[in-house]
Amino acid sequence: SITSKCGSADLMEALGIQLMVDLSVHRRALEALNFTFFFAHAFHPVFKAIMPARKALATEGQKTIFNLLGPMINPAQPKHQLMGVYSKSWIDPIAEAMGALGLNGGLIVHGVPVPNSALDELSCAGVNYHKGFGTLSDYSGTLELGTAGLAECDAEDLKGGSVEENVSLFIDFAENNNDAGIKQG
């Protein structure tokens, strides 16, 4: 992970999923499981080359354009995409770019769990901003959890743990342990 204790790739690797595999493995996984995980380094070697600079900037709290480029150069070339951005100011330009890339439709999202904080994803805490592109181009604004039928959680519940803690949480969730995940009010 660049900006947290445990990112998606860290979790996948700890679960025994090989990240550096060729496209045929991804194709089989997608067909069999309806899921695959594209590790940027496997498809875009420049991401590996710039990792030291990205990590150094991340320790200073700096995000880079590479945080945005990864999802935009997805090797699967999906027809629809949900993409999070780390700053509200990127919502409109990225939505415009995704539309120009020829995707049928999707949403660009940004979460603000508490004032003066930011997430590059939708959040069950605070407020979410979104803008659609393509077939969803009329869909934009603020998403309130209540209007989506979801209960709001405390921002503290969203903080990730170590790789080991997150693996344990994932396994509990996968085994349908009702105590796993965000506690419901």
Predicted regions and their residues:
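Glycine-rich anion-binding loops and their surrounding alpha/beta cores
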Residues: 13-20, 25-185
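A short acidic, glycine/proline-enriched capping/turn motif at secondary-structure boundaries
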Residues: 1-2, 44
